[in-house]
């Protein structure tokens, strides 16, 4: 898999289908894998937040999300496909459902996550959501312990910050 650099961070050059295939393989193993759909705001945050920067550097798959990332790469002579995080997440939900893999959702306002779950359950056959929590929490360790108990193979995170998952968690897709 080829990676290109932008502002000191490695970004994968897979197209949408290739990213889905790669992430699906990651989801099937028992190792922790973090997938980030990177946007311009994340580069800015990484300048002042070393933990955030390290998560970006250590992610197994970094997908260019946001026209700013695509343009930045194009300016440096690298033409890559922009992969919208929401489209990628939706496809990974479909893959998980087809393979009967448990998923977790973390983030958003309480009413938004509830509506999302209702919509997904209505639209996606065989969906197995084993855990959900809104993005308003102070006890990170409690959330991590709850996730470990549920053993999801895919965790979709929609927060203004990245979460660092230890070696007991599955694929975590963050955008």
Describe every region a protein language model picked out.
Residues 71, 162-164:
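Short glycine-rich, flexible loops that bind phosphorylated cofactors or substrates
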Residues 39-40, 108, 159-160:
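Short, well-ordered beta-to-alpha junction loops that form the rim of enzyme active sites
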Residues 1-86:
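N-terminal nucleotide/polyanion-binding subdomain common to many enzyme families
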Residues 58-61, 102-104, 152-155:
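Short active-site oxyanion
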Residues 70-146, 150:
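Conserved beta-alpha
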Residues 53-58, 165-175:
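A short, gly/pro- and small-residue-rich
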Residues 147, 151-161, 168:
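Proline-aspartate-enriched helix->loop->beta-strand connector
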Residues 48-49, 75, 117-118, 167-170:
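Short amphipathic alpha-helical segments
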């Amino acid at each position: 898999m080829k990676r290109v650099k932008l502002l000191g961070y490695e970004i994968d050059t897979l197209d949408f289908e290739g990213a889905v295939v790669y992430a699906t393989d990651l989801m099937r193993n028992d190792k922790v894998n973090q997938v980030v759909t990177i946007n311009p705001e994340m580069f800015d945050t990484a300048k002042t937040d070393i933990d955030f920067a390290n998560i970006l550097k250590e992610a197994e798959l970094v997908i260019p999300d946001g026209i700013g990332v695509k343009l930045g790469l194009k300016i440096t002579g690298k033409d890559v496909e922009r992969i919208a995080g929401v489209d990628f997440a939706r496809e990974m939900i479909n893959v998980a459902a087809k393979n009967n893999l448990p998923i977790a959702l973390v983030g958003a306002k309480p009413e938004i996550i509830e509506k999302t779950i209702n919509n997904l359950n209505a639209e996606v056959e065989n969906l197995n959501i084993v855990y959900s929590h809104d993005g308003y929490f102070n006890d990170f360790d409690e959330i991590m312990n709850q996730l470990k108990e549920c053993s999801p193979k895919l965790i979709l995170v929609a927060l203004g910050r990245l979460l660092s998952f230890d070696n007991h968690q599955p694929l975590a897709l963050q955008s």
